[in-house]
Amino acid sequence: MIKLAGNFLITTVIESLGEAFAFGHKFGVDPHTFLDILTNSLFTAPIYRNYGSMIASDKFEPAGFKLPLGLKDNRLLLAAAEEAAVPMPMASLVHDRFVVALAQGLGEADWSAIARTSYQNAGLRKEVTE
């Protein structure tokens, strides 16, 4: 359960980064500048630097942890949470992000590719660029 909870936390960071980058992009902020400011001030942990760099560069291959594996862990987490009657709305949101990314052909990509859906939802990218 701890591994699932840890992976859940990572996916929520990825989701949050995707939304934040899309927000910044809408206001004309260069993604690399955005990343530099974030990771040199409030968010200095490696997880923000590493996943933020992938999102800023829109490069999700080679995958460190493939998207289908993230979906698998997310499903296991949601099943365990349901069994224990623990609502996890963020996990449900992330689940949908995984499904969308897989539907767009990102099965070989790093699980951080779910961040692309935030860009697409903001009208910034209409198609997957590989």
Please identify what each model-predicted range represents.
Residues 128-130:
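ATP-dependent carboxylate/acyl-activation modules
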Residues 2-122:
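Helical "substrate-binding/catalytic lid" subdomain
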